[in-house]
Structure formats: C-alpha cells, structure tokens
UniProtKB/Swiss-Prot annotation:
This is Type III pantothenate kinase. It comes from the Bacteria. GO terms for cellular component: cytoplasm. Substrate binds at residues 100, 107-110, 184. GO terms for molecular function: ATP binding; metal ion binding; pantothenate kinase activity. Homodimer. Its cofactor is NH4(+); K(+). ATP binds at residues 6-13, 132. One of its GO terms (biological process) is coenzyme A biosynthetic process. It is an enzyme of class 2 (transferase). Pfam families: Pan_kinase. It comes from Clostridium botulinum (strain Loch Maree / Type A3). Keywords: ATP-binding, Coenzyme A biosynthesis, Cytoplasm, Kinase, Metal-binding, Nucleotide-binding, Potassium, Transferase.
C-alpha cells in the first residue's frame, strides 16, 4: 500500500492505494502551525478508524503548494512511517513535458493533475481544478503541458465580497432557479455561481481555440476540486468530473519513481 498526500492552501487530502485501487481517503485542514506529532496523532486516528496499520504502508508521495508545512509533514512521515517520502518537484519523473517559460513556476498540483489526466484520457485536455485558486491547464495528446490560467477560487471571491461589503451577508453557495432574484441572499448566490460558470465557459472556449490553432484536436475538458460538481451543472464546457484526479496523479508518479 502507498500513502499519497495532496497539500493545498486550504486542505490536505490523504489517500491510501492498494495497487491501483483507492481504498481510503480523508481531508484535513492545512495548518502550518501544527507540529509533526500533531499531524501524526491525526493520521493515527484515521488509520485506526479504517483498521489500517502504519506497517501496511510501503511508500509515501507528497504534492504541496505550501512550502511552510513541509518540514512538519516530512518529519511526521519519517517518525511514524520510517519512510523517506517522494516530494513532487524538480528531478521527479512525471512523463510531462513542461512548456512554461520557467518550468519551476508550475505548481505541483497542476503537474500532478496533468499526469493523471494524460494517463486516463490519452487525448488533448483542458483540466480545471476548483481549489483555493481555480486553475485551467492545457495539455496535448503528446503530454506537453502548454500552460494555462489561474483565477481566484470561488471561496476566495465570495469571502472578498462579504469582507468588503458590510451590508452583504455570508451565504451558502447553492444554485438558484434563475438570475432574476427577489432577495439579497439569492442574488449573491446566483451572481457567484452563474458568474463563475460563465467565466469557466469563456476561458475554456478561448483555450480550446488556442489549442486548435496550434494543431490540436478539440480538447476534452475534465474538472476536479470541491466546487466542480456545482459549477459543472451550469457550465456548458465541462465534459467530465474526476473527484480523485490529483490522488490518481500522485499514484502514477509514485509508480514512475519507486
């Protein structure tokens, strides 16, 4: 079995793979003030709840966009699992050719998603990840990572609205029947959700055109992340949702580097 960790700005997602099957996964809050032992205690509880033992784990791989937390996580893995984890970054084999001006600038999460999507779909791709930031990534059939777009995430955008507009209440992000709304709560909900769906469709249409102009076939659009399902219900551009895309990418990269 292997343990995979996707460390994001808001959450850490952990998964356990037995061969190619994801048998357990959990979500913890990202907190760079926690010590290795505090994270270790949390992981002990999760393993115990699922009748798993640390001795079952033969390898660990981590993807992180939060450098300040890595010391605690690496120390936790070393202390509790007695394993040196693979850290996704320069020098790790991914099979993806990064065409960025400076490849080191590309977030590990974006590369991991590209690895998974290329492995699964084997076609030109646009990958949308609805995380703390929303990212759009273009990947060719030949596994060339062309680049993409980064937007403020849905929660960041809505939090900014609530923080800066004193009279506007915080609302649950749920779909409204339409956009001509009769109260403030529904008006905010429709603005965020339908506005974001429109943003997705416009960026995807522009990205598709640019990829086709480069000689690619029409890309397949796959979405992942916490708000993927909500936005996909209104977006006309998303072909498929893959909720475990990042975890799958970590598994594939582990296999390439073990």
């Amino acid at each position: 079995m292997i343990l995979v960790l996707d460390v994001g700005n808001t959450n850490i997602v952990l998964g356990i793979y037995k061969n190619k099957e994801l048998i357990a996964n959990w979500r913890l809050a990202t907190d760079n003030k926690r010590t290795a032992d505090e994270y270790g205690i949390q992981v002990i509880e999760l393993f115990s709840h699922n009748n798993l033992s640390f001795s079952d784990i033969e390898g660990v791989i981590i993807s992180s966009v939060v450098p300040n937390i890595m010391y605690s996580l690496e120390h936790m893995i070393s202390k509790y699992f007695n394993i040196k984890p693979i850290i996704v970054g320069p020098g790790v084999k991914t099979g993806i050719n990064i065409k960025y001006d400076n490849p080191k600038e590309v977030g590990a999460d974006r590369i991991v998603n590209a690895v998974a999507a290329h492995e699964i779909y084997k076609k030109p791709l646009i990958i949308i990840d609805f995380g703390t930031a929303t990212t759009f990534c273009a990947v060719t059939k030949e596994a060339n990572y062309l680049g993409g777009t980064i937007c403020p995430g849905i929660k960041i955008s809505s939090d900014a609205l609530f923080d800066k507009a004193a009279k506007l209440p915080r609302v649950e992000l749920v779909k409204t029947p339409g956009v001509i709304c009769k109260n403030t709560v529904a008006s905010i909900q429709s603005g965020i959700i339908y506005g974001y769906a429109g943003q997705v469709d416009y960026i995807v249409s522009k990205m598709k055109k640019e990829m086709i102009d480069l000689g690619e076939e029409e890309p397949f659009v796959v979405a992942t992340g916490g708000f993927a399902k909500l936005i996909s219900e209104e977006s006309k551009s998303i072909d498929e949702i893959n909720a475990i895309l990042t975890l799958e990418g970590l598994r594939v990269i582990y296999e390439k580097n073990k």
